[in-house]
Amino acid sequence: MMKSLGKLAFEQLQKGNLIFYESDLTECGIDIRAASVYSGVFTQIFKEERGLYQDKVFCFVHLSVQEFLAALHVHLTFINSGVNLLSEAQTASRWSKLFTDKQNLKYLHQSAVDKALQSPNGHLDLFLRFLLGLSLQTNQTLLRGLLMKTRLSLKTNYKTVE
């Protein structure tokens, strides 16, 4: 469920959406009934459209929850499959065979920094902080159940800053 929520959070963050519809949930593989268990993560609100019917509209309980889950999704996708969701060309899987894991992580971080800098309203700033924080060794230990490989180091973070 965490991976699906992360995918939803990332897709909606990229679109700049704070609210989303039931169809967005199903596109990310989230069953509404099963998701009700996670009612502390996102809430259902009702929005009346044209006065004819009520359409179910959802949002995360706080924007920072959406940004964290989006960063977690990007990080896990990259670590587990080598795909850089922030790359325009989506060729990270080819690059992963050419470079070491540390250089790839640097590439992911650089893509995130570039995207955040291109944002006119700074909507990716906290996402970037979460993404960089997920690569810290202390957090890798906490995420080991979700990660396939955890060979990251502090040197990668220093290279990103350079």
Feature annotation, model-predicted:
Residues 1-162:
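Leucine-enriched alpha-helical scaffold segments used for protein-protein interaction
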